[in-house]
Regions:
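Conserved core of the sugar-phosphate nucleotidyltransferase
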Residues: 1-8, 22, 31-120, 125
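Short acidic donor-binding loop at the edge of a beta-strand
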Residues: 14-24
Length: 152
């Protein structure tokens, strides 16, 4: 996994007396993240004095309106009553990991073998268009749409 690779690289650099206080992992499947996103996430880490920062974006569909269906497709218990008659704007905002930016204190990463230092991790909120994670052809088409939009 990525953490094992990062630790291996840090170990190899240590043999050459090269040390880094922080690492940043930029996934290649998130090509629309920009320099401004990266710089702002670093600023957040320094401001919060935290051990890790992970990028997120708002979900398009609120999970309070999502459920599984029984074999008979009945919707009797599909949505809990408190949320049934609310507009989406009145529901709490939910966020998801977007895979674009992971910042972490190198020592804490090595000690905890994770990019998520739970008691000292903060979210860097990115907009949807910078959060496209290319895992499918549809994602690639969406990324190309935004690239064309930015370049016009």
């Amino acid at each position: 996994n990525s953490v094992d690779v990062i630790i291996s690289v840090l170990d190899n650099l240590k043999l050459r007396n090269i040390f880094y206080d922080y690492i940043i992992l930029l996934q290649p499947t998130s090509p629309l993240r920009g320099v401004r996103d990266i710089n702002k996430s670093i600023e957040l880490m320094l401001f919060k004095e935290c051990a890790s920062v992970v990028s997120v974006c708002k979900v398009n569909h609120n999970p309070l309106w999502i459920n599984t269906l029984p074999d008979d497709d009945s919707m009797i218990n599909f949505i809990d009553n408190p949320f049934l008659n609310k507009s989406s704007q009145d529901l709490p905002h939910y966020y998801k990991l977007n895979g674009a930016i992971y910042l972490c204190d190198s020592k804490r990463l090595r000690d905890e073998k994770s990019l998520f230092i739970k008691e000292s991790c903060f979210a860097f909120k990115m907009n949807f268009s910078h959060s496209i994670d290319i895992d499918s052809k549809d994602d690639l088409h969406l990324a190309n749409f935004f690239l064309d939009k930015y370049n016009s």
